[in-house]
């Protein structure tokens, strides 16, 4: 389909870092900060996926409307 592999590795990397930070903060007793880190990581990934979907829709629109 042409999805760049770097994007998959970026998402996996952010997930690993968020999981690591969440575990450390949770063990330190900072559960509120751990939840915030998880939420911010999720929002960051959500925006990454939204830009990818936006690019996909632009390509589909260009194909069906014959626009460059």
Curated annotation (Swiss-Prot):
Ranges annotated as spanning the membrane: 5-25, 33-53
Instruction: State the annotated membrane topology for this chain.
Output: Multi-pass membrane protein
Q: Name one Pfam family in it.
A: SpoIIIAC
Q: Which UniProt keywords apply?
A: Cell membrane, Membrane, Sporulation, Transmembrane, Transmembrane helix
Q: An example Gene Ontology cellular component term from the record?
A: plasma membrane
Q: Tell me, which GO biological process terms does this entry list?
A: sporulation resulting in formation of a cellular spore
Localization per record? Cell membrane
Q: Which residues form the signal peptide?
A: none
State the source organism's domain of life: Bacteria
- Primary localization class, coarse: membrane
Cited NCBIfam families: spore_III_AC
Q: What is the name of this protein?
A: Stage III sporulation protein AC
This chain's source organism reads Bacillus subtilis (strain 168)
Q: Which gene encodes it?
A: spoIIIAC
